[in-house]
A protein has these predicted regions:
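Membrane-proximal envelope and lipid/glycan-remodeling enzymes
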Residues: 1-319
C-alpha cells in the first residue's frame, strides 16, 4: 500500500519522492483524526488536544517520523488510515470507514483485527439507535464489498510479485532472507514479553546508564496504553464494562500476542514500535461512554512526562 502514493508522487518528483515528509504527514493526519474523535465524544478542546498529542508526540510513534524508510511509511500510513476509519464509523459512515480499513490492512496485516471492532462498533451504535437489522446489514454491504475488492487486489498483486497471495515482502527482509529463523512462533513470546512488556528503558553498562536501543516496555514508550488499562480497570470496578469494551480489549490482547510472536519485534528502535499499531484501540476505548471528558491533573502530568521522554528518546536514537 505505501507504494501507491509513492507511485503517483514519482510523476512530480521522479526518484526523489518526499519520503521523510510523507511519514510526518501521516502522523499529523492521524493526530487530527484522533482530535476529532475526542471532540465528537465530548472532550473539551484542551483535553482532546492533549490526548491527541499523547498518541503522537508522547509515544514511540514520534521516532518513526524521522525516517522515511518504506516500513515506517507503511506503519504510519496504517495508523492514519485506521484512525480515519474509526472516525468515519463513529460518524455513521460505514462504507468509507470499511474501505479505509481495508487499505490499512495492506500496510499492517494484523490490523485486520480492527475489522471485527468496526463491525461491532457499528452494530452497537445502530441497535442503540433502534435501527432494524435489515437496514443495518444493508448499510454494511457496500463497504464490505469494497473491502473484499481491496483484499482481492492485494492478493493478486502479492501473487504476481512473490508467487504467494499472502506474502507481502516481509520474508525478503535481510534478517529473514539471509539470517534465517522462524519469523512468527510461539516460542518468541517469552523473550519479547520480558523486553516489550516488562522491560525498562535504561540499563547500566560500562559507560553508566544508557537508553536501551532494542526496545523496552510499550507501556512506558506509549503511555496512552496506561490510560487505557486504568480506564478499563475503573470500568470493571464500576460495572461499566460493556460487551463492546470487552470485545475491544480482547482484540487488543490478541493483537499484542500476535506481535509478540515476531522474532525481531522491530529490531533497533525507541520503545516498542510495533505496538504503535494498537494505539487506535486506546483512542476508541477512551471515546466510549463511561469516562470523564476532561483530563485529570495526573493525566496532564503523564502527558508532559511522556512528551519529554519521547522527545529525548527520539533525539538520542537519531544522534
Amino acid at each position: 500500500m505505501p507504494s501507491v502514493p509513492l507511485y503517483f508522487l514519482t510523476f512530480l518528483f521522479g526518484k526523489n519522492t518526499p519520503d521523510h515528509l510523507l511519514v510526518k504527514l501521516y502522523m499529523l493526519f492521524g493526530l487530527l483524526a484522533i482530535y476529532r474523535m475526542m471532540r465528537d465524544a465530548g472532550y473539551d478542546k484542551a483535553s482532546a488536544a492533549g490526548l491527541s498529542l499523547l498518541c503522537s508526540f508522547g509515544s514511540c510513534l514520534l521516532a518513526l517520523t524521522l525516517d522515511g524508510a518504506v516500513w515506517y511509511q507503511a506503519q504510519l500510513l496504517a495508523y492514519m488510515l485506521t484512525c480515519l476509519a474509526l472516525l468515519l464509523m463513529l460518524r455513521d459512515h460505514p462504507t468509507p470507514a470499511l474501505f479505509l480499513y481495508a487499505l490499512a490492512v495492506g500496510c499492517r496485516p494484523f490490523n485486520v483485527l480492527y475489522g471485527l471492532l468496526l463491525y461491532a462498533l457499528y452494530i452497537d451504535m445502530a441497535r442503540r439507535d433502534g435501527q432494524a437489522w435489515s437496514t443495518l446489514l444493508h448499510r454494511l454491504i457496500l463497504g464490505t464489498l469494497l473491502g473484499l475488492f481491496v483484499a482481492a487486489a492485494y492478493a493478486l498483486y502479492n501473487y504476481a510479485r512473490f508467487g504467494n497471495p499472502l506474502e507481502f515482502g516481509h520474508n525478503y527482509l535481510p534478517e529473514f532472507s539471509t539470517q534465517g529463523g522462524t519469523q512468527f512462533a510461539l516460542w518468541h513470546i517469552p523473550a519479547n514479553f520480558k523486553t516489550f512488556v516488562l522491560g525498562l528503558p535504561f540499563s547500566e553498562g560500562m559507560d553508566g546508564w544508557t537508553l536501551n536501543q532494542f526496545g523496552f516496555s510499550f507501556l512506558l514508550a506509549s503511555p496512552i496504553f496506561i490510560l487505557l488499562l486504568v480506564q478499563c480497570a475503573a470500568d470493571l470496578c464500576a460495572r461499566r464494562f460493556t460487551l463492546l469494551k470487552g470485545g475491544l480489549m480482547l482484540c487488543f490482547i490478541l493483537h499484542l500476542l500476535l506481535l509478540l510472536m515476531h522474532r525481531t519485534f522491530g529490531g533497533y528502535q525507541f520503545g516498542a514500535r510495533y505496538t504503535c499499531d494498537m494505539i487506535p484501540y486506546a483512542v476508541l476505548y477512551l471515546c466510549l461512554p463511561g469516562r470523564r471528558r476532561s483530563l485529570r491533573v495526573w493525566e496532564w502530568c503523564l502527558l508532559a512526562a511522556a512528551i519529554g521522554f519521547c522527545v529525548y528518546g527520539t533525539v538520542s536514537m537519531a544522534l
